[in-house]
Structures are given as C-alpha cells and as structure tokens.
C-alpha cells in the first residue's frame, strides 16, 4: 500500500507529493523549496527513483534541478509539455512579472498507458491534457494525482498558452471520472477530494455543471 506525503511549496502553494512504497519513492511536482523536499525524503528514509512533473508550469518544476542534483534521479514529463518547459522563463516574465532560473533538462518522457513501478506499487500514467498539452495524472490503487487538471470543487485554468477548456473537460469526464467513485484525488493545489464527490458536485464538470463540451 502506497503512502502519499504532501509538502506544500512555493509562492503558489503547490502540492509536492512523495509517493512511497516499501521505502522506494517518486517525487511529484517539486515546484520549489528543493532542500526541504530532499530533507523530508531523507527523514523518512525513502529511496527515490524518479522525479515526475504532472505538467511543466513553473510552480511545479522550479525545484527539479536541485532535487535531481542532490538525489541523482531522472526527471520525467510528457513530451507534449516540452515546448512549454523550454519557454518557461519568457512565459513567467510575461504573465507573472518576475524572473525564474533556466528550465531543467528532461531525462525521459512519459506517455499515456505507461506504468511506473515503485517497489510493489504500479502507477498508471493517464494523459489528461487541457490545462496544458502534456498534463498527466498518475493513478494507483485507490488514488489519483491530478496535477492542475482537477481540484476540490474546481478545475485547472485554461486561459494560459496551451490550455483548452473543452479538452480539459473531456479529460476529466472521459478519463478521471471513469475511475472508481471512492478514488482519492490528490490535486496540484488545495485539499484532497474524491472522484465521486467531484462527479456529484463539481460546479464545472459535475452533474449540475454549467460547462458543456462543444
């Protein structure tokens, strides 16, 4: 049974997750405060094997280079998010008005249907674009990490370059909402929820939602 640890990091309060199984672990969305993340990993005596970004907006990847250097593990993304990663500095300057370091280099790519083994835990990669072209969700036994696709009573924004509302709604309804209702959702920001709760009451994509796919 996996343990999922949450570390809230950075100015946008990103949820960085440490998914641990039998001391092996993957680090998901190390968006800032890398030394704190590594210290936590070492404190729980986990042995990380990958860094994974659910997508490559700056608040999910700023800590990657330092975490990778300290732990000597590869960084994985979906290939369709590579252009967004490579233009991270100019996009942050344009939309946020401040400077960030150069983007991290990518060591490998994930695609829909891939599986990541973390000891005896199998994590399934779901391509869930809409918030960004290469957004992925990571689904395991009774849980899914959704990045900025699906939140507690909300969905990811789609007004940034590469975002598309209809695509996001389709990803949520046709991929995430196919999971069991009691699946725990670990989003990129904010508190946990469940698939069942969001299917019922999410104001954007739930049963009474006002948004429809065109």
State what each model feature region is:
Residues 28-30, 53, 77, 120, ...:
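Small/polar loops that bind or transfer phosphate-bearing groups
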């Amino acid at each position: 049974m996996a343990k999922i640890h949450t570390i809230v990091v950075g100015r946008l309060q990103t949820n960085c997750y440490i998914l641990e199984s039998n001391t092996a672990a993957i680090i998901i969305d190390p968006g800032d405060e890398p030394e704190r993340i590594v210290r936590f990993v070492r404190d729980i005596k986990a042995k990380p094997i990958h860094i994974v970004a659910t997508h490559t907006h700056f608040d999910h990847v700023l800590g990657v280079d330092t975490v990778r250097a300290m732990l000597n593990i590869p960084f994985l993304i979906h290939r369709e998010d590579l252009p967004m990663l490579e233009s991270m500095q100019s996009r942050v300057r344009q939309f946020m008005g401040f400077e960030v370091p150069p983007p991290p280099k990518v060591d490998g790519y994930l695609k829909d249907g891939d599986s990541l083994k973390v000891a005896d835990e199998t994590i399934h990669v779901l391509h869930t674009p809409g918030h960004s072209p290469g957004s992925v969700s990571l689904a395991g036994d009774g849980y899914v990490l959704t990045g900025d696709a699906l939140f507690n009573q909300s969905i990811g924004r789609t007004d940034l370059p590469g975002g598309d509302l209809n695509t996001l709604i389709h990803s949520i309804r046709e991929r995430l909402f196919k999971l069991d209702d009691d699946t725990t959702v670990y989003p990129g920001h904010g508190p946990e929820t469940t698939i069942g709760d969001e299917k019922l009451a999410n104001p954007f994509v739930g049963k009474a939602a006002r948004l429809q796919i065109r």
